[in-house]
Amino acid sequence: MAKKKAFTPLLYLASIVFLPWWISLLFQKSLESWVTNWWNTRQSETFLNDIEEKSILEKFIELEELLFLEEMIKEYSETHLQNLRIGIHKETIQLIKIHNEGRIHTILHFSTNIICFIILSGYSIFGNKELVILNSWAQEFLYNLSDTIKAFSLLLLTDLCIGFHSPHGWELMIGFVYKDFGFVHNDQIISGLVSTFPVILDTIFKYWIFRYLNRVSPSLVVIYHSMND
């Protein structure tokens, strides 16, 4: 009976890690053909933001210039002009396909991430008992660690998240999340998040040390500041 009680929270933890990912992947595969068909056949309007519109126009102009340059070095004939029109037509269709694939990717990834969020919310609402057990295990594990190890772990975590070299890591992480949700890459938004998010985390962490750690474990705060200095 005791083994069963101990096994249930572990099974719950494993399901939190793998089940949302598995269900969202299954959902994405099952909806991919339907979304592709809907977008390519029934979507009459094309929604472009400024970045996408500029990118597609630049690619089209570059393509047109290359094809015209290629034809300029040849003899002008009706056949060559016809080939030029066919080439522009084919590449235009290819650009449209690339744009459609990007839009389909956005819809699918955004939908699957919403599903993951709903599943995790359901876990937090209906799995309160298992979460309490897991929380008690984590607190017991942290309580058994020495203050030196705790201070070292805090220092390592803060250096990784808000240290001198952290902006590059945040840039990669935010860019990955941004891409995972299917949004178009935007350097201005990503750089803005990279410059503000670590500052907010640093403020929250210092407030947490001041309000919580000073009251619970003053010795840990002393060791942490000694290591940090």
From Swiss-Prot:
The chain crosses the membrane at residues 7-27, 107-127, 189-209. It comes from the Eukaryota. It is found in: Plastid, Chloroplast inner membrane. It is a multi-pass membrane protein. GO terms for biological process: potassium ion transport. One of its GO terms (cellular component) is chloroplast inner membrane. It catalyses: K(+)(in) + H(+)(out) = K(+)(out) + H(+)(in). GO terms for molecular function: antiporter activity; proton transmembrane transporter activity. Keywords: Antiport, Chloroplast, Hydrogen ion transport, Ion transport, Membrane, Plastid, Plastid inner membrane, Potassium, Potassium transport, Transmembrane, Transmembrane helix, Transport. Its main location: plastid. Pfam families: CemA (PF03040). HAMAP family: CemA_PxcA. Contributes to K(+)/H(+) antiport activity by supporting proton efflux to control proton extrusion and homeostasis in chloroplasts in a light-dependent manner to modulate photosynthesis. Prevents excessive induction of non-photochemical quenching (NPQ) under continuous-light conditions. Indirectly promotes efficient inorganic carbon uptake into chloroplasts. Belongs to the CemA family. This is Potassium/proton antiporter CemA. It comes from Guizotia abyssinica (Niger).
